[in-house]
């Protein structure tokens, strides 16, 4: 779920102030609470440098999620569900790169959540929402109380608690995608899977070669509803079991106390705890006896391979020769995963004045813990025993004891921690023609750790086809920073900043930043910024870690023309086969470095009208990434290729053959790719941000108009150092990036009423592909260009409306309806499971949220 599209735009390089009326806060919180379709959220408005944006709470770091993404091997994303939303006063967003004060690793900027200060009173709120189809339901209850007046009582205590719940949504429930003919769009409503509850049998292509890829007649036990023909096999719709949104609930509390010890010394303590629980259901386990079977590795790197075959004489083998099976273990039930994420945070701070300095020092401890309990993966020792002793009947009735032995629960844990001590100070230095020069400086000592432990049985390799992720690492970072603000002329102000970081596991880094603002006219200010950033590799990329995943790939060796396999190959060489991938750490990685530039102006002809425009550019080099499994396979025989290695089946019976039927060594099906993180090429991104605001009086009320837009001029990506740059803006080659995104909002406030209407726009991107015959990439289904009517993902426009009312004493009523026209997400042929791109679109259609807040003031 894209935070900025679903939940409204954030502030620019300034602050979003919390509205003074309770209704504004209720609406902001309601919007934020809609952003929980995924348990782990990352925030990004510009290019997808998702893991390069720094998230802060009250100006200090938040521990990242205790999760290593098995698809990327990376482990530095943030779970924003752990932040107590009802206690938030405003959100600061710094978009111009790294910050000397906050951190040089914020290549893509900073998001800073600021808690309420000196709050007095109490309020309780309830909210709920759903779509028109009454799915994607969510409910929230929150309460906030504050007592003590700093000015009078010299103390203040803030208490905040919140509970959130959402219902699960089956994959086929929402009518989520345009052109919603599921049989043609990703085959979501069709019996396309031959992994069925009744086994489908396959014989060897050549007796004794161990390659089971010749289909046999459909089992007569197959129900009529699942039978396509006498030879097409028993079928299933794999989407029957999948959820597009998991069920979840979250509860959290925060306590913040502030006390003035004297006129020059103040103490603050914060304590927060949040628990988020997700329950996810997926398809029952399956096994495939065709191809190379299931391949996986244990923690030590030992390879396992299981091919689902039945010998002659097995009661479920009706043939006089060995057979391979494609089978869905439906009697084991759906796969169930429960994830519990706990986030704890303790902060103790002192602020005061000393020797002409405003001084602040603090100790921070931030921790996230993840416990995952899951089943739905076959227990290898029990599976081998069940096949050998015939205790499991394929397509028959099985005992509870056998089912339990095949499908035990497993548990994995993860933990990340950040602890730091810092000292900051600021003061005015001397007089300049434009005012007083001011200096801010400080030091920070920080320790980071990341640990992931998989279930011991999983580490040993005792679950069929499941990846084992293990991480254990820590490091310290010591930093010095300073920032000087110098109004050198009455209409010219400069800012100079520098930060020095020393990593225990990496080199030191010094990153400067420079800013200039020139007030050319009373109504016009021109500004420019230059900054550098430094991001050391994450702990999962360099430490004693091992991350495994699975990828679907085609094989250019066995299917060089992309459509017809060579002799000895099979159809999956062309259409795609699932292979294992192993990510190994790279201790020689160099840090990423970036430079950012921005130039813009602020034009304010009156106090009611303003126009801001910024041209920005980010250049990132030494980018840490890995080649995809497909890229590794495509370059298997490229001299000097360092992207990874390919491991193929070594059984000569699986090799390609010559015209005379002689096996060709080294041409077996791909089983595994071994990949490492590398310092690859460079990314250069350039765009324009626009912000137009105007307000005026009308009918005794006030109208506010606001338009925000980001235009991506270029997204140049260089895969390897010295290689060619490819522009990914507006196409699908790199990250499926639209060129234009924006909103236009009109709001009207009068008396107790406040309402708004907002227009949202997300541009499309093309799918032109010169490597295919049609010239247009259409995914892996039977779509035709004529059916879609264009070679692109369409642009998406939606309209939101909202209103709030404060006319009832102490009550605030608010309602928001998003996508009032019920426009479905545009179809994306590259998203073969969802059918839409979750980075920019959502499956909600028209959806509403209502809230009631009662204030005890």
Where are these regions (language model features)?
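Extracytoplasmic beta-strand/coil segments of soluble accessory domains associated
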Residues: 2-65, 102
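N-terminal periplasmic accessory domains that precede
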Residues: 3-11, 79-81, 105-126, 141
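Non-catalytic regulatory/gating segments with a bias toward low-complexity or hydrophobic composition
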Residues: 7, 91, 111-113, 124, ...
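Short acidic/polar hinge/loop motifs at secondary-structure boundaries
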Residues: 44, 60-95
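C-terminal beta-signal and adjacent terminal beta-strands/loops
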Residues: 66, 610, 713-714, 759-776, ...
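Surface-exposed, low-complexity loop segments enriched in small/polar and acidic residues
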Residues: 70, 167, 175-184, 211-248, ...
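Short loop/turn motifs that connect adjacent beta-strands in outer-membrane beta-barrel proteins
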Residues: 83, 118-121, 150-155, 261-265, ...
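C-terminal beta-barrel architecture of Gram-negative outer-membrane proteins
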Residues: 144, 549, 705-806
